[in-house]
Amino acid sequence: MPNRVIIFDTTLRDGEQALAASLSVKEKLQIALALERLGVDVMEVGFPVSSPGDFNSVQTIAKTIKNSRVCALARALPADIDAAAQALAVAEQFRIHTFISTSTIHVESKLKRSFDDVLAMAVNAVKYARRFTDDVEFSCEDAGRTPIDNLCRMVEAAITAGARTINIPDTVGYTIPSEFSTIIETLFNRVPNIDQAIISVHCHDDLGLSVANSIGAIEKGARQVECTVNGIGERAGNCSLEEIAMILATRKDKLGLETGIVAKEIHRTSNLVSQLCNMPVQANKAIVGSNAFSHSSGIHQDGMLKAKNTYEIMTPESIGLHRNNLNMTSRSGRHVIKHRMEEMGYHTDDFDIDSLYEQFLKLADKKGQVFDYDLEAIVFMATQVAEDDHYRLQHLSVHSDSSEGVATATVRIKVEGEDLTEAAIGNGPVDAAYKAIARASGREVEISSYKLSAKGQGQDALGQVDITAKYQGRTFHGVGLATDVVEASAQALVHVMNLICRADKVADIKSQIQFNREHAGV
């Protein structure tokens, strides 16, 4: 049995299902490139038949990624498999991942078929997918609640049909480690052709057991783990990639297994996914949480000073989180900032040093010392602005009357090269700023959620504002970042306005395509 575990990342497919708003193609490509640097073996990047947008993003990523195998999901239906194959055809190497439900409750209540019918559909789907590639993966959806006799039959039939990877999902996170590992062990004992396929597991975290179940399965012979960065995913999330990777690295003495993960890329990738997906990592999250390497107990601190391994089973540096003893202030030169970005794992083509240094100096003048998370926040926001350039917030000033709770805001916004200035009165500074921006843009939106979080520590920390807004029946998510809360709030709304503008352009293009189709040959 091989001593290497294949890491199958599904951040861009299963992970994206947890997001309030879908990622853009550019954002998905950023994450895909980060996953490639991280060293994932396979990345599942979408469900092409689900929408033209998903098809386009899968195709774009498939064209770009060279060192990881790109995979797309398809139900056990010819149309789904056709869409996946067409989107992936541009890739140097690709996998089609097809699936069907196998548990009694799914077969009877959702599919309304007999198990034998479902078995035949699975076999036909695998055979059909093999027309396009030798790398076909088959998943038994809700395997954790599937009668073991049926599961053994399904796995044997799928392997015979040509599946080279068989995935056993705990779709609803129901099993406990002893149960799940027994399922894997039983498959190895009872399926006669099991040696002709890699056994994979895909565990959800509804009971907080996804990582434990995956490790239990590995101990019984599974050699692929499906996971996501930061454990994001539907409901309570998926098995966490960084936890699986570091368990296997840290406990190689016990498990004797390895992966192809470049551990020093973990922190950087986690931060990128958190920022782009607007899903903050909880402070006590294993491996990548802000407290993961913090020691506040006096006894622990004393031990750490004497020998770090008294209370650290891995180092921050091992995941790319460097302890920085260099203070970055307005007196720091451009080369210092460039060097620090490279120390944090960024490549020179990930950021524009001139733009970064300009924003760094502005921030340093405001808050004195600038920290790593400040630099990363500036880089992240630069990607947002670069993508959404229809509206630009040029100036914002606010005056508040604390006695009456009334505020006046004046904004200057650049709209496709033209400066527009508007003022408004509101119930507080944020409300006033929003009304002024609405006037300048000519769009009235409904704010359905508003969230403020600190990016750093202390009173001079950067503030991130995340809003969800509704406009003409559609939902948009915006983010803004600044040392001033009102400015961050204004930037978040401008971000929403740009997303609306982009959506309108896409709708116009779709309408034109539809018109051309309807009038072709007329």
From Swiss-Prot:
Residue numbers binding Mn(2+) = D14, H202, H204, N238
Required co-factors = Mn(2+)
Say if the entry is tagged with keyword Transferase: yes
Q: Does the keyword Metal-binding apply?
A: yes
The UniProt keyword set, sorted, is:
Amino-acid biosynthesis, Branched-chain amino acid biosynthesis, Cytoplasm, Leucine biosynthesis, Manganese, Metal-binding, Transferase
PROSITE patterns xref list: AIPM_HOMOCIT_SYNTH_1, AIPM_HOMOCIT_SYNTH_2, PYR_CT
Report the principal subcellular site. cytoplasm
EC number(s): the record gives 2.3.3.13
Identify the SMART domains for this entry. Answer: LeuA_dimer (SM00917)
Pathway stated in the Swiss-Prot or TrEMBL entry: Amino-acid biosynthesis; L-leucine biosynthesis; L-leucine from 3-methyl-2-oxobutanoate: step 1/4
The Gene Ontology biological process annotation of the record reads: L-leucine biosynthetic process
Domain of life, per UniProt, equals Bacteria
How would you classify this enzyme at the top EC level? transferase
Catalysed reaction(s) here are:
3-methyl-2-oxobutanoate + acetyl-CoA + H2O = (2S)-2-isopropylmalate + CoA + H(+)
Tell where it localizes: Cytoplasm
Question: A single GO CC term, please?
Answer: cytosol
The GO terms this record gives for MF are: 2-isopropylmalate synthase activity; acetyl-CoA C-acetyltransferase activity; manganese ion binding
Pfam families listed in its UniProt record: HCS_D2 (PF22617), HMGL-like (PF00682), LeuA_dimer (PF08502)
For the region Regulatory domain, give the residue spans.
392-522
Residues annotated as domain Pyruvate carboxyltransferase: 5-267
Query: Record's family?
Result: Belongs to the alpha-IPM synthase/homocitrate synthase family. LeuA type 1 subfamily.
The free-text function statement in the UniProt record for this protein reads: Catalyzes the condensation of the acetyl group of acetyl-CoA with 3-methyl-2-oxobutanoate (2-ketoisovalerate) to form 3-carboxy-3-hydroxy-4-methylpentanoate (2-isopropylmalate).
Question: By its UniProt entry, which PANTHER family does this protein fall under?
Answer: 2-ISOPROPYLMALATE SYNTHASE 1, CHLOROPLASTIC-RELATED, HOMOCITRATE SYNTHASE-RELATED
Question: What is said about its interaction partners and assembly?
Answer: Homodimer.
State the protein's name. Answer: 2-isopropylmalate synthase
Query: What organism, scientifically named, is this protein from?
Result: Shewanella denitrificans (strain OS217 / ATCC BAA-1090 / DSM 15013)
Q: Gene encoding it?
A: leuA
